[in-house]
């Protein structure tokens, strides 16, 4: 978990933006940690409007560990590295994301200043193409979740060392798992950076003990899709995917801006003290992206409010819109037990999935949706 402060830093840094198709709010908070190691990006106009390619937007959350340098590098450079991949301009976006993650990792590895740096970061990103398709690339245990009519649908996998596919790669590369950690140290099994786990020159990047190679989930945006949530495990360790979707919905009904909903959720997750085994003591970052479906922002709020009022999908109780303060232990009590008993999944490293496949959706829900 790392060292904690005697009092949490509760100052929040928030921003928002939008166009006729999307609107986002994002916020981050240092919390109990001695430094802020998270980073994020929100790029509505990812590709030039004069480009021959369709319009794209890009969102990412990067949860650093062992320092903030890799997370900050990803915020500044990963989007452009992805966009520089030849496959991006050919419309092969899933390949561009995979090669872009590895290219960013390699660029850091070749940087002399970074070769001895112990830091690394997760990366959960959403590339939205032509307002119609989401390409979600993920490496690590940050998470991207879709809110569809009040139901949480996972668009990423949490890469934990005890997952069977991850464990097989780790041990094949000469690593081991102790107390649920890679070589007894790292609590996640994929990351950008963490070069001490990537030293076997006989293995390709995707076969190293820890790899930056992402899984990519492709989702065709549906008229029922309401919003997208990207967040670090500082949120997901405290709240399930479904709890967060319902919390966001309640904030929308209360006419709170998306960045204020982010701020309120972090207030809800922060631990009342630093003795909670790390739950609620981490840095926190959350980004909410609204799918306007051609509506104005006010009409989008009205649309979801009407759905909630007519009973279309679950929503947190009205009191949650005004609720402040820590409640992490009650909500998180069963999350770790749930992770400990997760069944192994059948997918291989760096696979691409179509989230509209019924079989895969069922598998996602069974495996990842708490």
UniProtKB/Swiss-Prot annotation:
Belongs to the PP2C family. This is Protein phosphatase 2C homolog 2. Its main location: nucleus. Residues 23-291 form the PPM-type phosphatase domain. Binds 2 magnesium or manganese ions per subunit. Keywords: Cytoplasm, Hydrolase, Magnesium, Manganese, Metal-binding, Nucleus, Phosphoprotein, Protein phosphatase. Dephosphorylating regulator for many key proteins. Has an important role in osmotic stability and cell shape control. It may negatively regulate the osmosensing signal transmitted through wis1 map kinase. Mn(2+) 2 binds at residues 63, 233, 282. It comes from Schizosaccharomyces pombe (strain 972 / ATCC 24843) (Fission yeast). Monomer. Mn(2+) 1 binds at residues 63-64. It comes from the Eukaryota. One of its GO terms (cellular component) is cytosol. Signal peptide: none annotated. Its cofactor is Mg(2+); Mn(2+). Its EC number is 3.1.3.16. It is an enzyme of class 3 (hydrolase). GO terms for biological process: endoplasmic reticulum unfolded protein response; signal transduction.
